[in-house]
Amino acid sequence: MSRIGKRPVTVPSGVTATVEGQTVKMKGPKGELRFVVHDDVEVKLEDGAVKVAPRYETKRAQALYGTARAQVANLVAGVTKGFEKKLEIIGVGYRAALQGKSLQLALGYSHDVNYAVPEGITIAVPKPTEITITGNDAQRVGQVAAEIRGYRPPEPYKGKGVKYADETIFRKEGKKK
């Protein structure tokens, strides 16, 4: 049994939650989100809280309902506070610039990398070596951050590349003569 799944997700004031079949919809100040819960998981809206329970006593249902509860909690957090990821660019000549709906990255290649900003995601570049990604969907914010980091992941010798702000790079020592 999942210990996380047992706890109901409270819906704060200012957020409206609806459950239609297996679809959970949340509407709040930061927008509207929906999540389709797996068929092995039962979802109910009771007393201003969303309750998640396994529909069957199978191992799969037990595994899925804790995940479903966490996803519903992310919906509530997304429509109230939103999510944010910060990236840092380290390296000589490495920089980022925002041009309209496109993020232009100079990452040491012979060409600049242009990344089209998806709908529902806001990208800010406070400094040429910092990128801030915000949005109300945790999965999409994380995916965009991972895609941008994937263009030039940090290398272990000098630490050059795009890294998460809270990430520590495991450094290696160079060859010895």
Curated annotation (Swiss-Prot):
Return the InterPro entries for the record: Ribosomal_uL6-like, Ribosomal_uL6-like_a/b-dom_sf, Ribosomal_uL6_a/b-dom, Ribosomal_uL6_bac-type, Ribosomal_uL6_CS
Q: Does the keyword S-adenosyl-L-methionine apply?
A: no
Quaternary structure and partners: Part of the 50S ribosomal subunit.
Q: What does this protein do?
A: This protein binds to the 23S rRNA, and is important in its secondary structure. It is located near the subunit interface in the base of the L7/L12 stalk, and near the tRNA binding site of the peptidyltransferase center.
Q: Which organism is it from?
A: Nitrobacter winogradskyi (strain ATCC 25391 / DSM 10237 / CIP 104748 / NCIMB 11846 / Nb-255)
Sorted alphabetically, the keyword list is: Ribonucleoprotein, Ribosomal protein, RNA-binding, rRNA-binding
| Family statement | Belongs to the universal ribosomal protein uL6 family.
Q: What is this protein called?
A: Large ribosomal subunit protein uL6
Example of a GO cellular component annotation carried by this entry: cytosolic large ribosomal subunit
- Record keyword Ribosomal protein present: yes
- Which molecular function terms from Gene Ontology are attached? rRNA binding; structural constituent of ribosome
What are the GO BP annotations of this UniProt entry?
cytoplasmic translation
